Amino acid sequence: KTLAELHPEWVFPSFSAALMYGLWVPYSRLNPIRICAPNAPYRRRSKHLWVSRLTPTDVHLEGEANVTGLCQTLLESALDAPVHLALPTIDSALRYLLISREDLLEYAQREGYRRRGIGRARAAFAHADGESENGGESMVRGIIIELGFMPPTMLQAELPDPLNQGHVYRVDMLWELDDGRCVIGEVDGA
């Protein structure tokens, strides 16, 4: 916010914009702060600041900062990170009902042509799920996908307690296997 006050002409893209939207952003993506400065003499990267000439297609005022539009924010985040680091941000946008997965895929098709990382971004959009309850669950699901394992068939599944009729257990991830067995994945406790 301080940078936005000092430089009102700057536009914040990618994970920096996602943070302003209140989306889940992995800690490792908080730095460097990303900035679009169309008048910047060149693309500059440092440990704390990443300035590019990227021209935002859609700019919104979020709080007191200019940020890229939500679709561009999510696309830039997904282009800029592996699936497991992009999924928390995308999942939270879906969870908060800010956008649909179909709109994201359509935007990626239209705006992502020939962009570096577009295949990875499309994969993140295709696997995004607003049922994820926190960024940790999203990251674990992303790692499972990146490693080539079958993604969960259901998130936040409710299972009956066989010993206590009427009581249910809720699990973070559920895999329903072809042979009828189920595998449960729990990220943050029981």
Per-region residue spans from a language model:
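Short gly/ser-rich loop at a beta-strand->alpha-helix junction or flexible surface loop bordering the NTP-binding
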Residues: 1-117
